Amino acid sequence: MSTDARANHRIKSIEIDEESLAAASRDQEQERQVAIFDLLEGNYFEPAEAGDGPYDVRLSLIENRLAFDIASAGHARRHLLSLSPFRGVIKDYFLICDSYYSAIRNSSPQQIEALDMGRRGLHNEGSNLLRERLEGKVKTDLDTARRLFTLICALHWRG
């Protein structure tokens, strides 16, 4: 894909519905802000049948489903994804993140590294699942899916 075509298929703005957003710890809020910054700095996001972007994206929860509202010039579309396939990986991700944040303050570098490897593995699992669930609706690269997965988790954090 050419650089110009790739530049047109990107998210230019991302919004998380405040009503859907769960309370977050300071660490979680920082992780969310970093994910938003990194996502907007570089991403690949190509909705099916949407034409050229860039795109404005809004994430929210609607009746226990994840809503992706995607808009660009002359295009607006909502994709709803069931949260059921994500529940296990999100639950495990939260558990290991809690352990990781605690370890940063109290554990050896080896323990922190082991938890970080587990955290990254679960993050990759969630990101790959997101790409699978979006198949036929939206194409993304792995880095974009990873950042979106972080933001999806933000909708579930229960401070």
Swiss-Prot record:
Highest taxon of the lineage: Bacteria
Disulphide bridges, residue numbers: none
InterPro entries registered for this protein in UniProt: UCP032146
Coiled-coil segments: none
Record family assignment: Belongs to the UPF0262 family.
Name listed for the protein in its UniProt record: UPF0262 protein CCNA_02430
